[in-house]
Curated annotation (Swiss-Prot):
Protein name from the UniProt record: Uncharacterized protein AF_1754
Classification via InterPro entries: Brnchd-chn_aa_trnsp_AzlD (IPR008407)
Family statement: To M.jannaschii MJ1155.1.
Amino acid sequence: MVSEKVLAIIAVALGTYLARFLPLKIKFATSDKIKSFLSLSSTSVISALFVTSVFTPDAAEFGVRVAALFPLILSFYRWRNFGLSIFAAVLSYYLLRLAV
């Protein structure tokens, strides 16, 4: 049986993919209202994923997640590279989880 975590990861991955793919796929064959909705919905989906991943009822886990945001912010302001800043956040989260 597939665990709930695996299903959640698949659902988030599918939602993230569709939020990026659909605006590109139907970019030329839609009205202005649909284009506006799709451009705003992709931002909303990413924001919702961010909020649900940062806020947790566990205080120690919340502290680790907030602490992992600092390398993300600092590396983004330093290099202006989303990929590098996300890598810095993931690495810092991993190292913090090992320490806690």
